[in-house]
A protein has these predicted regions:
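Residues that cap or initiate secondary-structure elements
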Residues: 27-29, 38-40, 82-84, 95-97, ...
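Short small/polar-residue motifs
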Residues: 1-6, 71-77
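Intrinsic, low-complexity N-terminal interaction/targeting segments
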Residues: 11-18, 75-100
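Mixed-charge, glycine-accented linear interaction segment located at domain edges/termini
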Residues: 95-116
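One face of beta-strands
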Residues: 3, 17-21, 59, 65, ...
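Charged, alpha-helix-forming regions
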Residues: 1-25, 30, 34, 39, ...
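Generic recognition of cysteine residues
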Residues: 23, 73, 106-107
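Short, well-structured hydrophobic secondary-structure segments
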Residues: 27-69
Length: 116
């Protein structure tokens, strides 16, 4: 299986956007629904650009707080795996499957490289 992260818009209004996130690696695949707004999307774009331009060594983005007190959280921490252009993205996802987010979550790495 090819590693990837795919976001698909489910709906939006003037305050929020609901996204379906599918994150896949050789060891795990998760599907979860998260809520974001324009500012959170802009922050993810900014973090990725800063990382790719070499302005930061590591980027971290999350759509909210981890835990049972809110909607499902998805966080992405990205950093260089080596000097050959390989990148690791640590995916932490709370699964919105009816259980407590503190108990129904997973964390794994998605591998990619510059230019993909």
């Amino acid at each position: 299986m090819k590693d990837n992260i795919i976001f698909s818009k489910i709906w939006e209004d003037i305050f929020a956007i609901q996204l379906k996130a599918v994150c896949s690696s050789s060891v795990a695949t998760i599907t979860t629904e998260i809520y974001v707004d324009d500012d959170l999307i802009d922050e993810l774009i900014f973090q990725i650009k800063q990382f790719l331009d070499g302005n930061i060594e590591e980027g971290l983005w999350a759509n909210g707080e981890k835990g049972d007190g809110s909607t499902a959280c998805l966080s992405l921490r990205f950093f260089n795996k080596d000097k050959l252009g390989h990148i690791n993205i640590e995916v932490y996802a709370e699964l919105d499957d009816g259980g407590k987010h503190s108990e129904h979550n997973c964390c794994f790495f998605v591998e990619t490289e510059y230019g993909l």
